[in-house]
Amino acid sequence: MKLIIFTGLALLLIVSLIDVEAQNEGACLPRGSVCTTNHAGCCSKLSCDCYRRFEKGVEKGQKCWCIPTGLRYSKEKE
């Protein structure tokens, strides 16, 4: 009887840990999401990369996105 109770509690603990892990993973920002700073909560293997936008020489603000770590975008030559 003790073995059945112990096994049930162990299974409940494992299921609870799996659920908590799934909730923590869902709390991060996926690829392509807008983030606010370089230290935002992008998912693992992603970083928050920011750039400044200019239109006709006038700064239009800063945009930040969650992109794969190490990936860099550059301006296309016209």
Swiss-Prot record:
Keywords assigned by UniProt, alphabetized: Disulfide bond, Secreted, Signal, Toxin
Protein localization: Secreted
PTM field: Contains 4 disulfide bonds.
Gene Ontology MF term list: toxin activity
Tissue note: Expressed by the venom gland.
A GO-annotated cellular component: extracellular region
Domain of life: Eukaryota
Database matches in InterPro entries: Spider_toxin_CSTX_knottin
Propiece span(s): 23-26
Family recorded in the similarity comment: Belongs to the neurotoxin 19 (CSTX) family. 07 (U7-Lctx) subfamily.
Protein name from the UniProt record: U7-lycotoxin-Ls1a
